[in-house]
């Protein structure tokens, strides 16, 4: 049996040796150092690099580990430093990235070490249940985070007013703490069981794997299948609510446009028949200001719904990837327990060894999903890879003082409005009317033209 210090050094030397050996660098000095260092203390159990043979799967695993750790560190940095990402959903995604990063730091390297030793556990035996517990903890935390995100978004869309009361940063942290508490509660029994009875965590007294059928069944349903069912149901309910809100908004907006057209028609008729428009009787004096408020509301509401749809699309891809990556492992794990000796146990073990690594790969895919489908994450990752860690500064806002009512010609009105806004003007420059009254109040103009211009025009 090796001690913990030698085991850690052995793992590091194996990783270095793999990289050097894989790229055909002269490895005889490295092999000699590794052999001389560990053969004396490791009882001759050091994994030997065969001459002329390259272990491409092992190198691929090393690359996956590096990408998993690096990608999730970028996600954590983006949510921490970008103010645009400071919301409940992204706090959950940052906590999920922490779990995935810990998978790359603590779980994957030990699993690679087990592969290099041909699934014979090379570390102290008491570390086996600890490693299994960490594996279950982070896997459970991943599915619980996705389940919590799905529930939180559904409640936010279904009852936005009620949800806004509980959507502060503190409340989001409390929800994340509950997710981690549930995950810890699922994984804590493993080291307790394993330290009392090593047969529960060792197969053939050599391979470190969870060997308690009851815990495998209960843990699989509690940690995977039940949260997965909740996540899928709430996700489809969210899509349904968004579609219904879109249809209701479009129908309401269409009716409003018809009402506006009717009102404009009445005003034009009154102007032709009665001369001045301001002297024409308005059938509903309150219609005009109310119409102005309604014209702005559908645009903002539709934009909010479109943003929710985009976010739901990204999260849906994350959910789908997680489902595809982890379902094979958990289904095979349950089948191996239910069928017992009727199944080919060697085949089941090989399938589980492959499927568990497919699940590990999921921890490194999420940052790629964010990069492909979210511009804010993509820009943040690009900045950090260039070693630019300065947060984006908000553009300054210029305050335009209140302008008194002034008689302007049509051409002057066009010039002044086009100078301060990109919106089209109702009257053309060659309007035959000599002048019109205009008053601008509370006009805010950001330097960045992409921002929304807020202005109020009356007495036109």
Swiss-Prot record:
Record motif NPxxY motif, residues: 366-370
Topology, Extracellular side: 33-56, 113-129, 191-214, 339-349
Cytoplasmic compartment segments: 82-87, 153-168, 238-313, 373-460
Documented effect of changing residue 459 to D: No effect on interaction with MPDZ
Sequence motif: DRY motif, positions: 152-154
Region Disordered, annotated ranges: 276-301
Keywords: Behavior, Cell membrane, Disulfide bond, G-protein coupled receptor, Glycoprotein, Membrane, Receptor, Signal, Transducer, Transmembrane, Transmembrane helix
Annotated motif PDZ-binding, positions: 458-460
Cysteines engaged in disulfide bonds, as pairs: 128-208, 339-343
Positions that bind ergotamine: 140, 210
GO cellular component term of the entry, any: dendrite
Gene3D superfamilies: Rhodopsin 7-helix transmembrane proteins
GO biological process, one term: positive regulation of phosphatidylinositol biosynthetic process
Residues of the signal peptide: 1-32
Family designation: Belongs to the G-protein coupled receptor 1 family.
Protein name: 5-hydroxytryptamine receptor 2C
Gene: Htr2c
């Amino acid at each position: 049996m090796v001690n913990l210090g030698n085991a850690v050094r052995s793992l590091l030397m194996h990783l270095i040796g793999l990289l050097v050996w894989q790229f055909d660098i002269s490895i005889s000095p490295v092999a000699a150092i590794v052999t001389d260092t560990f053969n004396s203390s490791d009882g001759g159990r050091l994994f030997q690099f065969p001459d002329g043979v390259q272990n491409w799967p092992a190198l691929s695993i090393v690359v996956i580990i590096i990408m998993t750790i690096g990608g999730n560190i970028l996600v954590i940095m983006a949510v921490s430093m970008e103010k645009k990402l400071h919301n409940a959903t992204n706090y959950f995604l940052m906590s999920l990235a922490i779990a995935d990063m810990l998978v790359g730091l603590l779980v994957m390297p030990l699993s690679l070490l087990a592969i290099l030793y041909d699934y014979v556990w090379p570390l102290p035996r008491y570390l086996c249940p600890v490693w299994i517990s960490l594996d279950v903890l982070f896997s459970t935390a991943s599915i619980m985070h996705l389940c919590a995100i799905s529930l939180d978004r559904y409640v936010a869309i279904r009852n936005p007013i009620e949800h806004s009361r509980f959507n502060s940063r503190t409340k989001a942290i409390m929800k994340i703490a509950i997710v981690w508490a549930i995950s810890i509660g699922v994984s804590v029994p493993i080291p307790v069981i394993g330290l009392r009875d090593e047969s529960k965590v060792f197969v053939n007294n050599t391979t470190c794997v969870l060997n308690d059928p009851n815990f495998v069944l209960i843990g699989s349903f509690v940690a995977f299948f039940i949260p997965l069912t909740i996540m899928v149901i709430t996700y489809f309910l969210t899509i349904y609510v968004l579609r219904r809100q879109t249809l209701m908004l479009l129908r309401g907006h269409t009716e409003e446009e018809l009402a506006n057209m009717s009102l404009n028609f009445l005003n034009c008729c009154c102007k032709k028949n009665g001369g001045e428009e301001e002297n024409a009787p308005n059938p509903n004096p309150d219609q005009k200001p109310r119409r102005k408020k309604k014209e702005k509301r559908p645009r903002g509401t539709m934009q909010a719904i479109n943003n929710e749809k985009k976010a739901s699309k990204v999260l849906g891809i994350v959910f789908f990837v997680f489902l595809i990556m982890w379902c094979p492992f958990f289904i095979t794990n349950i089948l191996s327990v239910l069928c017992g000796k009727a199944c080919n146990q060697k085949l089941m073990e090989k399938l589980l060894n492959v499927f568990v690594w497919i699940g590990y790969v999921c921890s490194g895919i999420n940052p790629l999903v964010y990069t492909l489908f979210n511009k804010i994450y993509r820009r943040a990752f690009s900045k950090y890879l260039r070693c630019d860690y300065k947060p984006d500064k908000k553009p300054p806002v210029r305050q335009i003082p209140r302008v008194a009512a002034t008689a302007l010609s049509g051409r002057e009105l066009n010039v002044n409005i086009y100078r301060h806004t990109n919106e089209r003007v109702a009257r053309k420059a060659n309007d035959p009317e000599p002048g019109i009254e205009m008053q601008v109040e509370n006009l805010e103009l950001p330097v960045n033209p992409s921002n929304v211009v807020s202005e109020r025009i009356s007495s036109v």
